[in-house]
């Protein structure tokens, strides 16, 4: 990771492979919090390229706990941490879309930068967000709406979550 740190300090772009390796490392028990924080901050400050975002997404998709869903399912994943301080639009949109007949697999987490993330909003409505994969799939089948709580669907984020929480912004590369 030292080589990536040097590269980012020089404001050099990472390759797809380097970005993927970085995010895999951040999401591992081997990650050193101070180094991971520095790397994520430098990446954000430099500006994340499409290649870096694709590498990060590839790394995350390789470690996700997937649900079985129909082809026509949609997701209203939150943009959280956008700095605009809006109310929880993505959660409202998920509920409205499902009520209108769409199949919605809402993905989200607790807030990192505002008062209420999707998890807090749904808990306030009495929703049990800590469901296993099979229970989430059953919700999607029975009511055309489910919540994929990030902590349960991205178990490797248990390592990255505390690192991201200590930063003053949400790092797009690890969302």
Language-model segments: which ranges?
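Alpha-helix C-terminal capping segments
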Residues: 45, 91-105, 123-125
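Self-splicing inteins and homing endonuclease
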Residues: 57-80, 133-162
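General beta-strand structural signal in soluble alpha/beta enzymes
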Residues: 75-76, 104-108, 129-132, 147-149, ...
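Acidic, glycine-rich active-site loops and adjacent beta-strand->loop/helix elements
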Residues: 78-83, 108-114, 153
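Short glycine/serine/threonine-rich phosphate/pyrophosphate-binding segments
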Residues: 82-94, 114-116, 157
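A glycine-rich helix N-cap at a beta->alpha junction
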Residues: 121-139
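Conserved small/polar residues in nucleotide/adenosyl-binding loops
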Residues: 169-175
